[in-house]
Amino acid sequence: MTDRYILAVESSCDETSVAILKNESTLLSNVIASQVESHKRFGGVVPEVASRHHVEVITTCFEDALQEAGISASDLSAVAVTYGPGLVGALLVGLAAAKAFAWANHLPLIPVNHMAGHLMAAREQKPLVYPLIALLVSGGHTELVYVPEPGDYHIIGETRDDAVGEAYDKVGRVMGLTYPAGREIDQLAHKGQDTYHFPRAMITEDHLEFSFSGLKSAFINLHHNAKQKGDELILEDLCASFQAAVLDILLAKTKKALSRYPAKMLVVAGGVAANQGLRDRLAQEITHIEVVIPKLRLCGDNAGMIALAAAIEYDKQHFANMSLNAKPSLAFDQFPDSFVIN
C-alpha cells in the first residue's frame, strides 16, 4: 500500500506550525514557531502582532517541516489547514499559505476545525474508541463534546462566559505572574492548600454548562481587598484554592456527561490538558472508563493535531476549494461554504 502524507498548517492564534503526518497517526515532523516571548509584555496575545509574526516565519516552517520529515512536496497527498475558530488575521495567514502551496502542487485542500484538532491529537497516542466524550479545555474554549463516530462532533456543554485557560491567565496577571500563567499556577498550587474556598459556579445544577467569570471575579476581589487592607496573601494557597475550584467544576460536569452518554472513552485535550493537577484528579476520580490525554507536546496549538484530524476528513474525501475563507467564530457543526465532497 502506498503511504499517504498530509502537510498541515496551524496559525489560529500565536503559534505558527507546520507538520507532516504519515498515514493515520505517525507524525514525521511538527515544527512550531512560538510567539510567547513577544506577547509576554502585553499580558496576552495582541492580534496584529500575532499576524505579523505568522507572516515572518510561515515559509520557514514549511521548509523545516518537509526537511525534518525527509520528504518533498511531490510525496504529499493533501494539504490541511485550520480555518477557524481563532483570530481572523492569524487564520488568514495560514490559509493563504496553505492554499497557495496546495494550488502550486496540485494537492487537495482539507479544512480543519481547530477544536477538532485538539480532540484528535489523542489519536497519536492510541486509536480512539467510539462513541466517546471529550473535555476540551484551552485559552479560548471550554467544551464537552459527544463524538459518536469519527468526525461527528456534538457540543453537549460549554462555558457561558470565560474559558478556563482565559481565567487562569487573568488571575495570573492579577498575581503578577508571567503570561501564560497556567503552568506557574499549577506548580504553585501543588505547594499550597485550598484555604480561600472560592465559589464553584453551577456545580450542582443538572445541565452541562460551565461558568468561570464568578470564580475569576471572586479571586480578583479577594486579592484587591487584601491589598487595600494590607493583609498578607499566601501565593501558593491562592493558586491552590483557585485551581481546586476549577478542577471541581471540570470534574463534576465531566462525570455528569459520562453518566448520560454511552461513551467508551474520555478524551481530555487542549492547552489546559497539560495541567498536572487536572491529570492527577482525572486519574484518581475517573477509573471506570479509559481516559486519553495527548502528550504534552500536543496539548498546545500545533499543526500535528490538525494533521491528525485531517486524516479522518481525507478518508471521507472531505475537501474544500480555493474559495475557503477564515471563520473566526467557527462552530463544531459548521462546514465551510466551499465544502466539496468528491
From Swiss-Prot:
GO MF annotation terms: iron ion binding; N(6)-L-threonylcarbamoyladenine synthase activity
SUPFAM superfamilies assigned to the protein according to its UniProt record, in alphabetical order: Actin-like ATPase domain
Cellular localisation: Cytoplasm
Catalyses which reaction(s): L-threonylcarbamoyladenylate + adenosine(37) in tRNA = N(6)-L-threonylcarbamoyladenosine(37) in tRNA + AMP + H(+)
Cofactor entry: Fe(2+)
GO cellular component: cytoplasm
Positions that bind substrate: 136-140, 169, 182, 186, 275
E.C. number(s) listed in UniProt: 2.3.1.234
Cofactor note (record): Binds 1 Fe(2+) ion per subunit.
Top EC group: transferase
Keywords (A to Z) from UniProt: Acyltransferase, Cytoplasm, Iron, Metal-binding, Transferase, tRNA processing
Family: Belongs to the KAE1 / TsaD family.
Protein name according to UniProt: tRNA N6-adenosine threonylcarbamoyltransferase
Taxonomy of the source species: Bacteria, Bacillati, Bacillota, Bacilli, Lactobacillales
Recorded name of the encoding gene: tsaD
